[in-house]
Amino acid sequence: MENIDPKDIQELIDRTRIYDVLTRYCRALDRCDVDLMRSVYWDDARDDHGVFNGGAQEFAEFIIREIQQWFEVTMHAIMNVHMELDDKTACTESYLFAYHKVRGDREKVEEIFGSKYLSQFDWSKVDGIPHVFYYGGRYVDRLEKREGEWKIAHRQVVMDWNHNEISSGIFDEGMFKTLTLRGARGHSDPVFKNLID
């Protein structure tokens, strides 16, 4: 049997812990959990997110407030994650796919999407109908390991593409009416009933 270098084992542990930080961020966004969001960043971390550029702890409060104000539901997922790391620092590029459902009032839709998007609709027919946008991009992060714990020290968000349209979501007809367990923000989401304390 081949001898396994303890450094290789430690690298696997570090990669797993870094990935956990990245996925906790997505959960924090979609469950609107400010405390969980803060927990993925160091106190002196920065987030350059486009709509916000500054201290990451302040960003946590800002982004959760914005999500609650503008969106009925969001879902963020990371896919391919490329990591380069040493003992104390990691640089990651995480491919991102996100879904956002925007409340259908004209003012909100215009603020999110802009007047060019708005002009393509007869608002007498679509007023009140939610709109959605799909977003593809990347989180480019520098994480640091301090006292054995990995957290984000700096995050940049890169947008690669987006797609926007009127929502065609169905919840009360066909097979969808039988799917009665629904996601929710905060601790009323079904996942919290299954968590191990």
Model-derived features with residue positions:
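Short beta-strand edge/turn micro-motifs at domain boundaries
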Residues: 91-93, 124-127, 136-173
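Short, low-complexity N-terminal intrinsically disordered segments enriched in polar/charged residues
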Residues: 1-27, 31, 39
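A hydrophobic membrane-anchoring alpha-helix module
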Residues: 157-164, 169-197
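Transmembrane beta-barrel outer-membrane domains
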Residues: 16, 72-74, 132-134
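Mixed-charge, low-complexity intrinsically disordered segments
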Residues: 101-132, 181-186
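Short beta-strand or tight-loop elements
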Residues: 76-79, 135-139
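A solvent-exposed, acidic/Ser-Thr-rich amphipathic alpha-helical stretch
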Residues: 34-118
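Short beta-strand segments enriched in hydrophobic/aromatic residues
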Residues: 29, 41, 96-98, 156-159
